[in-house]
């Protein structure tokens, strides 16, 4: 369990809070808006109304005691930059900030953010990849080059063993697991025959995965 300082309770911040609560973490939530703070109270450990760009207020939170500080402020980039800088100056261990553009991302990284999330761009990329192919069911980028895909097994692969396909050597594609009725089966080997009633999780270079499954 981690202690999380979450600043900004717009739609993104509220969704982050809900997931953190589901995962069992301790959450201190902060927003200027009293209504937002009151609405989030049932799913967080504590919540305060305040201006995170005010250093006096921020000091009262004990920034250095949190494992992660998440700056989820939307539509007020000046406050986001100020908050990010102050958090780092006050000894925050890990600052994760939200950006809405590439320019904002670069600015946040220069001003104290350890990591930056770009939810609109990430969701746009996921949507474009997911719905431009009949075979791709889910997509998780790992870095700028590699991704996990959940894909339907191509008809030409059905009935063949993983070893016979040899896609790791020929295409750099690693078949990591099969998935049937929502359950993962990671007990696979070169001798595993690919059936027609499940999907598979594959790992590889994003461009190669798109070439193999994106049509």
Set out the residue ranges of the language-model regions.
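Cytosolic regulatory regions of ion transport systems
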Residues: 1-215
